[in-house]
Amino acid sequence: MLKAVQILGWSSGLTISQRLTKTRKSSTVSFISSSLNLSSVTSSSPRRIFSFKPTRMSSSLPGSDPVANSPTFVSVQSAGDVRKIKFCQWCGGPTKHEIPDGEEKLRAICTHCGKIAYQNPKMVVGCLIEHEGKVLLCKRNIQPSHGLWTLPAGYLEVGESAAQGAMRETWEEAGATVEVISPFAQLDIPLIGQTYVIFLAKLKNLHFAPGPESLECRLFALDEIPFDSLAFSSIYVTLNLYLEDLKKGKLKFHYGTINKRPGSSPSDIRAFSLDYHLQP
């Protein structure tokens, strides 16, 4: 898992020019003030900042249980289903499910070689692409959330940095060549074992087109972002934080934990609280 303080001062002109290939509605809850005049919003260049202050946002739906949304409760509910691990990934032997000595969680342990299978979070990387007061979104052509809008993003692969993975995913999903400017947000989602790292980026040229995983790619004006048709809570949070920063005239780095409301539908992208929100 990336630590926020380790990536704050990161800045680069990384670009990706070669073609990469891959085998491979809701309540009216919003972070944005209703008085926000998007026509008066201007962006500023990201800055290196090394101090943080904690805040807490909530977009939980009415009637949500604050106890059920607590980090302790969510961590229990988000434990991986180790019982699905039937065989050892190293020797192929059958596994047993026990709590190893000195540990607290149930693990899959090979009955032949004795190795323990640990389940670790997956990192999702992507780009928030700015161009002349607009942001680039992709309409998904795959499940989950087929037909809904998202930032170009996907799983980080072995052998690439987070920034390289974000650029690769942008090329694969939007056919866009981008320059990464700075990290913008790290959002942990314990319930599903994912960490999102989103970078601010700019287009190297005006060419973009949907890849196999996208139905459409489009630049949206800030007041036209389809918040009622976004694919994931992480994208909903990222775009709202971005607009809030623009309103304040200063782009910042954000770290937070998205705790999904237990029992809510996976398609309900607003049933969450944003905890441990750290920002300059």
From Swiss-Prot:
Gene3D superfamilies: 2.20.70.10, Nucleoside Triphosphate Pyrophosphohydrolase
Tissues of expression: Expressed in roots, leaves, stems and inflorescences.
PANTHER family, per database record: NUDIX HYDROLASE 23, NUDIX HYDROLASE 23, CHLOROPLASTIC
GO MF, one example: FAD diphosphatase activity
Name the UniProt record assigns to this protein: Nudix hydrolase 23, chloroplastic
Organism: Arabidopsis thaliana (Mouse-ear cress)
Keywords: Chloroplast, FAD, Flavoprotein, FMN, Hydrolase, Magnesium, Manganese, Metal-binding, Plastid, Transit peptide
Functional summary from the UniProt entry: Mediates the hydrolysis of some nucleoside diphosphate derivatives. Can use FAD and ADP-ribose as substrates.
Binding site for Mg(2+): E169, E173
Enzyme Commission number(s): 3.6.1.-, 3.6.1.13, 3.6.1.18
Family under the similarity heading: Belongs to the Nudix hydrolase family.
One Pfam match: NUDIX
CDD domains: NUDIX_Hydrolase
Sequence motif: Nudix box, positions: 154-175
Top-rank taxon, per record: Eukaryota
Record-annotated Nudix hydrolase domain positions: 120-243
Localization: Plastid, Chloroplast
Highest classification ranks of the organism: Eukaryota, Viridiplantae, Streptophyta, Embryophyta, Tracheophyta
GO BP annotations listed: flavin-containing compound metabolic process; response to light stimulus
InterPro entries for the chain: Nudix_hydrolase, NUDIX_hydrolase-like_dom_sf, NUDIX_hydrolase_CS, NUDIX_hydrolase_dom, Nudix_N
Transit peptide: 1-75
Listed GO CC annotations: chloroplast
Reaction catalyzed: ADP-D-ribose + H2O = D-ribose 5-phosphate + AMP + 2 H(+); FAD + H2O = FMN + AMP + 2 H(+)
Cofactor(s) needed for function: Mg(2+); Mn(2+)
